[in-house]
């Protein structure tokens, strides 16, 4: 009871009004990369393209990059080694996938090759990027990717090139 009145059956007013309008993206030119800019870079390697290669083709690519001891390695390990060696020489890596946002706020770009299931070659998308670009689960995102640092397990999205096959607009 408040002020001697019975509030039974009455709806409480919300403490604050929630703004249901879509937020405008607030990203800068440093957050995006054009597809032409990516493709113009020397020695661009594409993660989706590597996923389609056979194991023998991957081993040939690895040998040409002087990566050794991959004779009995799994496909994912060979791909991971190729990408890591490629990035060590400061060459760009192109990644693409369908975004799945987890409850913690971050997300992963999943591949149709793995039926959109979690895998070691998924690309991590930070909560900050998800907010900046107003991304949602199911969006197709592509861009430049960096290899995992020492304490990380996944490749990470550096810059966004396209969202749902269109360049992001500010």
What residue spans do the PLM features occupy?
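Charged, low-complexity terminal tails
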Residues: 1-125, 134
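P-loop NTP-binding catalytic core
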Residues: 135, 148-170
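Loop/turn positions that initiate beta-strands
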Residues: 138-140
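Short beta-strand micro-motifs enriched in acidic
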Residues: 102, 146-148
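Conserved small-residue-rich
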Residues: 131
């Amino acid at each position: 009871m408040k002020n001697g009145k019975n509030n039974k059956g009455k709806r409480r007013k919300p403490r604050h009004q929630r703004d249901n309008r879509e937020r405008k993206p607030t990203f800068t030119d440093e957050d995006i990369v054009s597809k032409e800019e990516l493709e113009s870079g020397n020695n661009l390697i594409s993660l989706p393209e590597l996923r389609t290669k056979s194991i023998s083709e991957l081993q040939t690519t690895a040998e040409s990059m002087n990566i050794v001891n991959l004779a009995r390695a799994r496909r994912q390990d060979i791909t991971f080694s190729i990408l890591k060696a490629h990035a060590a020489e400061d060459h760009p890596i192109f990644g693409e996938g369908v975004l799945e946002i987890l409850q913690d706020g971050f997300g992963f770009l999943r591949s149709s090759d793995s039926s959109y299931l979690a895998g070691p070659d998924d690309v991590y998308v930070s909560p900050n990027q998800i907010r900046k670009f107003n991304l949602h689960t199911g969006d197709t995102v592509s861009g430049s990717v960096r290899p995992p640092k020492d304490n990380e397990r996944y490749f990470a999205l550096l810059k966004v090139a396209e969202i749902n096959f269109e360049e992001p607009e500010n």
